[in-house]
Amino acid sequence: MWVYRLKGTLEALDPILPGLFDGGARGLWEREGEVWAFFPAPVDLPYEGVWEEVGDEDWLEAWRRDLKPALAPPFVVLAPWHTWEGAEIPLVIEPGMAFGTGHHETTRLALKALARHLRPGDKVLDLGTGSGVLAIAAEKLGGKALGVDIDPMVLPQAEANAKRNGVRPRFLEGSLEAALPFGPFDLLVANLYAELHAALAPRYREALVPGGRALLTGILKDRAPLVREAMAGAGFRPLEEAAEGEWVLLAYGR
């Protein structure tokens, strides 16, 4: 196993993370001011990183030791080897290539917002489901969730995570267009990025019932005005905003 070590944090290096996965990274780990990207062998990358060969057992043991439960009240996101005795609702997620382990601000913002806005029995769309953590959380709150993702590689992991948590959301390969025939939905949650939210704003309205709610995150603070303008133009009314670090969540009503 080879590690490509970059100075910085996952948040600071967020713009280049897709390029690491496109280059063949099997996973990422933030540790002591660095981001480690794991590869089966060195490849040419256009970044200022350093390659280092590590033993599979060495890095895996260190990674497991450093990975802590992630609190997002009323939830806690756990790896399968974690134990937890608190009162929070457990979400057991196998860390891997799919986004959504609870260690990123946007995932925590979305989990907390789900708890505030989801009503038991709601039909929920998780757009860009990744690990399935938001769809799983919606089911645990009494919703009926559909998770969609354009990356077919993440869906088996999402399904395995759902089974691990004893819930049965439906997962589907595709974009928002693929989800529309299963709607309209009472609640939409999407952890994407500002420009895509802005482009999809009219389609979000189409996906929701009258009075439905849209929870949008993956938005950097300085890009939030773009989303606000697009959602207002699509006829949405603002419900709330929440922030953590450099990231925001914007909630809207249809």
UniProtKB/Swiss-Prot annotation:
EC number: 2.1.1.-
Superkingdom in the source lineage: Bacteria
Keywords: Cytoplasm, Methyltransferase, S-adenosyl-L-methionine, Transferase
Pfam families to which the protein is assigned, alphabetical: PrmA
Keyword Cytoplasm assigned: yes
Transmembrane stretches, start-end: none
Localization per Swiss-Prot or TrEMBL: Cytoplasm
Residues where S-adenosyl-L-methionine binds: 107, 128, 149, 175, 191
Traits of the deletion mutant: Mutant contains unmethylated protein L11. Null mutant is perfectly viable.
Entry note about domains: Contains an N-terminal substrate recognition domain and a C-terminal methyltransferase domain, connected by a flexible linker.
Function statement: Methylates ribosomal protein L11. Preferentially recognizes free L11 before its incorporation into 50S subunits. This function is dispensable for growth and thermostability.
Name this polypeptide is given: Ribosomal protein L11 methyltransferase
High-level lineage: Bacteria, Thermotogati, Deinococcota, Deinococci, Thermales
